[in-house]
Amino acid sequence: MGRKRSASSSRWLAEHFKDQFVQKAHKQKLRSRAYFKLDEIQQTDRLFKHGMTVVDLGAAPGGWSQYVVTQIGDKGRVIACDILDMNPIVGVDFLQGDFCEESVLNALLERVGEGKVDVVMSDMAPNFSGMSSVDIPRAMYLVELALDMCRQVLAPKGSFVVKVFQGEGFDDYLREIRSLFNVVKVRKPEASRDRSREVYIVATGYKG
């Protein structure tokens, strides 16, 4: 006899397939609904311009990278990384590996090269256990790694957009970002589910 889905997972699946952004993504042959989150951020904050170099952390299945290539044009460049595999996207240099591992970080830095990048973006999230005492520290560890990437590769006046889950450590992290960037906003895009703790910190004017 097969295992039955839990009530919560069945509810999530029902919500997922009814979601207008999931339906739009499917209709437009987009990688994921995350495409629309970044589009809303771009309409408000104007992070991406033609010819930019962008680092995409936690890139799979590719919604953000897919969006960014439409904004930066054929002279721009996206360097993307995820622990999961991702189907190729024209204009995206993809590295599969665990960003938490030093060898993967070094490989990513090698792909970036000697120059600095214009935007670092992170949609990374841990595999959630359902226990906030475990999940939130894991999520905060990933966003700290993303901020460390900014310190290493982001050009002065560059931008950073990162998915963060509200909980313990959020306020301290926000203060840390405010010390490094001139303008910092917290966004909750329409395409982000209301029940989700996720928000997006959008930081511009890197002081590095």
Curated annotation (Swiss-Prot):
Catalytic activity from the UniProt record: uridine(2552) in 23S rRNA + S-adenosyl-L-methionine = 2'-O-methyluridine(2552) in 23S rRNA + S-adenosyl-L-homocysteine + H(+)
GO cellular component, one term: cytoplasm
Binding residues for S-adenosyl-L-methionine: G62, W64, D82, D98, D123
Highest rank taxon of the organism: Bacteria
Keywords: Cytoplasm, Methyltransferase, rRNA processing, S-adenosyl-L-methionine, Transferase
Root EC class: transferase
Matches recorded under Gene3D superfamilies: Vaccinia Virus protein VP39
EC code: 2.1.1.166
Catalytic residues of the enzyme: K163
Keyword Ligase carried by entry: no
Locations listed in the record: Cytoplasm
GO terms, molecular function: rRNA (uridine-2'-O-)-methyltransferase activity
Protein family per UniProt: Belongs to the class I-like SAM-binding methyltransferase superfamily. RNA methyltransferase RlmE family.
Name recorded for this polypeptide: Ribosomal RNA large subunit methyltransferase E
Species whose genome carries this gene: Glaesserella parasuis serovar 5 (strain SH0165) (Haemophilus parasuis)
